[in-house]
């Protein structure tokens, strides 16, 4: 049976009273329902209230959901403050890495982009353009190597321990994913910049007509 959960502006669906699911996934009691909603919505399980058909769901954690008159697609409204997650050691590690390393990576790409654009303007004599193009090609290729090293470093970071709460662990994983996606975006942009530079070098070398 599916029930719809509304927490602030977020809508989710939960399967309840499905005994054929794995033991860890089955939601048969009020306590299991509370825990699932708290995990999905980052809500404090101790202070949240669940409103169902105009009444608050009350009772011990072992109360069976089958006694609470749920019907298919019933709506549960979650009332309660969000958990105030702290920046634990893993999250702080990611924040520090972003501040001291990844911001510089963005600056390096922006500089390469500007230098390639300056080269394409053709203000320098041709021999100097050729020389500058070779130097830029090395810089642009080095950027990829540096970005790959950052990806390896992020992948190897121990941002979750045995004592990390699940909601904090989820937050840490999402933060790392955001950083990884940002680096991969820069890598894609840098690959396009390298192709652009190499095409201009081909023009300078006479391989492609101007």
Swiss-Prot record:
Residue ranges occupied by any Ubiquitin-like domain in the UniProt entry: 8-85
Pfam families named in the record: BAG (PF02179), ubiquitin (PF00240)
PROSITE patterns: BAG, UBIQUITIN_2
Highest taxon of source: Eukaryota
rRNA-binding is among the record's keywords: no
GO terms under cellular component: cytoplasm; cytosol; membrane; nucleus
Keyword list, A-Z: Chaperone
Molecular-function annotations in GO: adenyl-nucleotide exchange factor activity; ATPase activator activity; protein-folding chaperone binding
Gene3D superfamilies xref list: BAG domain, Phosphatidylinositol 3-kinase Catalytic Subunit, Chain A, domain 1
Signal peptide start and end residues: none
Ranges of residues in domain BAG: 108-194
Example GO biological process: chaperone cofactor-dependent protein refolding
Quaternary structure and partners: Homodimer or homotetramer.
Function: May inhibit the chaperone activity of HSP70/HSC70 by promoting substrate release in an ATP-dependent manner.
Domain notes: The BAG domain probably mediates direct interaction with HSP70.
Protein name: BAG family molecular chaperone regulator 1
Organism: Caenorhabditis elegans
